[in-house]
Amino acid sequence: MMKLQKRFLLLSALVATSLVACNNAKPEPQPQVDNTHVDVFVLSGQSNMEGSTYYVHPNGTELLKNYFEEEGMDYEPVAEGIPTVKTSYYGFYYPNGWAQAHTASPDTSSPEARMTPNFQPTKVGMGVGDTVQGKKDIFFGPELGLANTIAEAASEENPVHLIKCAFSGSGFTKTDGANWTKRDEDPTKSLFYLLKTYTYNCLHAIEETGKVPVLKGFLWHQGESDGGDAKYEDYTRTLVGDFREEFKSYAVDEDPDKIAFIDCTIYDGKGTSKMSYGTAANNAKLKIGNESEDDLNFCINANHEEGGLGLEIGDDSKGGYNTYHYNTPDAYKLGKAYGEIILNNNLLRDK
């Protein structure tokens, strides 16, 4: 199948947001296996994938609702839940190290208990479980914009399932256990083990409902922790290859290369929080996303300096909790960008 290179310009008079992707293919539509087939996408990475953006500020400001109203969008579906796209999520935020995180996750004293799948209509509040100023579950991640973008292409009878397993502060080169390179069968040493285990748990839960899960894509957002590492490209290729091989039995035709990989560049804008060290990661992401017209590797270009979406981070008053996290409108746009790649490349079954 041949990829088509497309680029969307940001014209505020015409569109609310734009998608600038490293490549934007148009493969043949995915086959409709039968009425038991449901599409599945796995979302993983670190805090901006886990969801570290306010939808409502601790001071009570309805940041996401206000953004929707400004853009003339209906807020009710994302507030009440999108029934055609269900999400189950697992992860934790650990500012003080892996050991503490693994023994004291935000929602329960047993992190393993949180690995029980719980698919719900996608809505606000599916971000980090951290409590800020006494307020809890006030965060969201890319799952929201993604779900709202593909909602009408799915159905309540055969909803798209999103499996989100992401860990704040994690990286390929971390030494405290929060490491994506290790393949130990030990949850205290390997994030890939946790990702693998949770993904299987969720796939089996779908099967128990009588549906047949078909894994269509692996969505990644990571690099803030180790974006300057010269081996970032190698680490990424290994991760994607291992993921595809691990879950090939759930791929279309059991072909691992039919599991799409959708990445995103990390922040490169100006300001005190500029992640200038992320150049190596962004170069790797763009290279992997652009190198072939025949694969299913994609990359959202979120950059400022490379003519991308120009997504902003770190403005607390605009929802960017802490230094490195997307502002509220930008976190939604990021999810929308993932969703548009899925739609533009026919990665969904006929509903």
Roles of regions detected by a PLM:
Residues 1-9:
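Bacterial N-terminal signal peptides that target proteins for export
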Residues 8-16:
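Sec-dependent N-terminal signal peptides
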Residues 23-25:
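Bacterial signal peptide processing site
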Residues 18-21:
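C-terminal motif of bacterial Sec signal peptides marking the signal peptidase cleavage site
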Residues 28-351:
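Cell-envelope and extracellular/periplasmic
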